Amino acid sequence: MAIVQKEKLTKDLFISLLIYTLPVLAIFLYFKLTNGVVAESHIALPSFLEFSKPAFEHIRTWGLTVFMLVLGVIEFGAGLYDDQWTGQERKIDIICFLAPKLLLPPVIAFFSLTALPYLIPNLANTLSWVPFWGGFFLIAIADDLTQYWYHRLHHQVPFLWRFHRTHHSAPYMGMAMASRQNFIYTVFFSQIYLTATLTYLGLGLPALFVLVIKSIITLGAHSSLAWDKPFYKYKVLHPIAWVLERLISTPATHHAHHADTSGDGVGHFKGNFGNMFFIWDVIFGTGLITRKFPESYGTKSYKQEEWYAQFLWPIFKSKKEGSPLAEGVIAFPLKAKTVEIAEQTPVLEQV
């Protein structure tokens, strides 16, 4: 079994390398067909998108936060959390929502404004000649395919899983848990630094559009407002649904990824890893499309973990006896608080 899995992993990585080269080859072909002359109008934002640039800039700076808050209010108003947002759930969701917005920008700023100019000082804006469409697809593929692998490996490598399990501990879906991640998992998002590097190389405008579009798709996939249901309900929309659910992440496919079981034929936590694009799961055979939603979410033995252990493991460890997060560095608070939990293997540990 291990040999088969290793062979599949090797095959998938090889296919990924080929996919990474596609936008590069397309840009090279364009460059050859134009005899090395890139039209100024091709580098700039297409005229039909020019009007949207201010909107995208506002969405990037504050609009996405407002979008999340508005969706969250609607979700709570509709009673979609079923009174599950209590205790440790509330603490970890709020902290994971606020902390990255305060702590991550300085990290990215240091990488973009200090590290990159020091490491590759002569390469700034060297890709500024790339047409907008080329830069868009280059960043979209490089960013999202990299995140697919980052996500997939955090499910398939037991040690890495402990950094990602925080995101799967929520017994509900929605804006409240969309940002719920271990901070170390977030800081080491490989695609963040990849996109920052491509922006430094001169692809800032395409990066802006990719960021906004990707954020809206991923937030929509986490939302408990199942916007994709009408596409499954009405037969006339089925052709559109067929394309959508294979191209991008939808509530149905991503909710299945957060299910607490795979035994019902709906949940699929061992797949559906795609973030913006679901097509990676289609290509690599890790996807499951049922057009149905799980009855319950989370993990079987991971309820109400302490917020500090979920957010900062292994710096802080859980006080819950038997928890995989109990093997940390620091016990906090200092006064022990032992809580017995059922001795069973979490469903998601079986990876």
Predicted regions and their residues:
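Alpha-helical transmembrane segments in multi-pass membrane proteins
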Residues: 16, 42-75, 87-105
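Alpha-helical transmembrane segments of multi-pass membrane proteins
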Residues: 19-38, 70-78
